[in-house]
Amino acid sequence: MIRAFVDEDVDAIQWLWDNGLSEYNFSSMKTTGKHTVFAPEHQLYSVARTYKPSANDPTRYKAAAHEIMDTVLATDAYKGVTIDFNTTANQLVANEQGQVLTVLATDENGQTVRYEAKKAVIMATGGYSGNAKMMSAFAKNGANYLVGGSTAADGYGIYMMQQVGANIDPTAMSYIPTFPMGHETAPGMGVIASSYMWKAGGISVNQEGFRFANENDADVVARETALEEQTNAIQYDIFTDKIIEDTEALNASVFWNFYYAPGKPYNSAVVCADSLAVLAEKLGIPAANLEATVKSYNEHVESGEPDEFGREYTEDAIKNNSAYCAAINKIEGEHYYAIPLKALVVMTLGGVSTNTDGQVLDVDGAVIPGLYAAGECVGGIWGRFVSGGTGVMGPIVFGRLAARAAMETEPATGYTLKTPAAVITEDMFAKDADSAESLFDMSQPLADGEYEATVDGQEGPMTVKVTVAEGKIAAVVVAENHETQAVAAAALEK
């Protein structure tokens, strides 16, 4: 599968280039001037291989990919494409020849819709990073992970394919990479928002008040898996005013400036105290442990000796690992700060098995006629951890391969569906009692007036205005959004 990805991705980039990518401004390597760069949000890799174009209209688009999508979908070649919104796919159905060419769905009015394909059904339903029950079932500490992506990524598409005999590797379902930088925005939900204070001398402690990893480790996987093993998968980044100042001076304060600084949206998450004991009390962790942890850390800063986790405290550490260690400081000063962060998931790596044409395979390795899959609902390609950049190009490449094969291949006849394995079970999709019912009693009249709120949309902030008249919601207007218009326009208009 990786060989197929490598062989196809140049053509995929060329396809994007021919459809408008050539008109964009790219980040470039200062040393070479080439468009391929390193992506700093991922662990550094050996060869610059990432393209980072900027949207031509940043007021409407967060990423060039969405702008290109709007451009491509507006061309004559795609005029016949219909997108059905507010319609939920429920079941795949095979015909008497064993061909999976039927999808049963439910529309917004609760009516059953039957879709009949001529040659193929392509499943591009995503993974299960939005399903806490599934993550809990397959990952040891999955119940503690924050959902960092769309709640629509519930894994049900994978379950639908399982029900027509698709093979699912249970081990690969446990491949749920996390990021040790999740800010909890709502119960069980979060966004990537590291403090980066550890770059300039900050430390991270667990619920017991102890450090558990080398915060400056260039191997991000080591830090990710270490947090997964901590109580409640939570860490507290501990830092001081001097560390904040150095982080800003060294241009390492992107998250602090955007999220946590005074006046920023998550500033309320910053816990401040005049002593470590008071800080520990506010965090609900043992004060004696935190004080002992900081004392030990400061002693290593003074001596310059590496600590038990391998963190180094010399100028050579800065010179040799500047991307992760920009300054060395003690934890001391008039004020002490903490930011709680949890393990957060934005993608999963388990799913159904396919061949290089995207054809879904059964438990015996045979092709299920007519059924294709691409993107995050396919499992076992990348292994246990994220390979930087594949989250974007993977779906593009394998989507093109699947679509090409679907157009060129007649589904085989005479196939018999295999008995589904019970890797994924129906109870993983059971809805919990909606706690919102106790918060919003819609049977009671609402207060008349106009209300406005800004929330996190899929592609950026979304401002919504609501008008209440005679105790009822009279109008809802999306005043500002950054969504991909070719996909979201119809839903936004409603």
Regions found by a protein language model. Give the residues of each.
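Glycine-rich phosphate/pyrophosphate-binding beta-alpha loops
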Residues: 176-181, 220-223, 343-349, 377-392, ...
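An anion/pyrophosphate-binding glycine-rich loop and adjacent beta-alpha core
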Residues: 158-160, 167-285
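Conserved redox-cofactor binding core of oxidoreductases
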Residues: 4-111, 132-133, 181-182, 294, ...
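Helix-rich C-terminal "cap"/substrate-channel and partner-interaction subdomain
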Residues: 232-335, 402-405, 409-439
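Catalytic phosphate/nucleotide-handling subdomain of diverse soluble enzymes
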Residues: 362, 366-410, 414
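A glycine-rich dinucleotide-binding beta-alpha-beta segment and adjacent secondary-structure elements
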Residues: 91, 289-381, 478-481
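Glycine-rich loop(s) and the adjacent beta-strand/alpha-helix scaffold that form part
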Residues: 110-185, 389-392, 398-401, 405
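Active-site- and interface-proximal helix/loop "cap" or "latch" segments in soluble metabolic
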Residues: 442-494
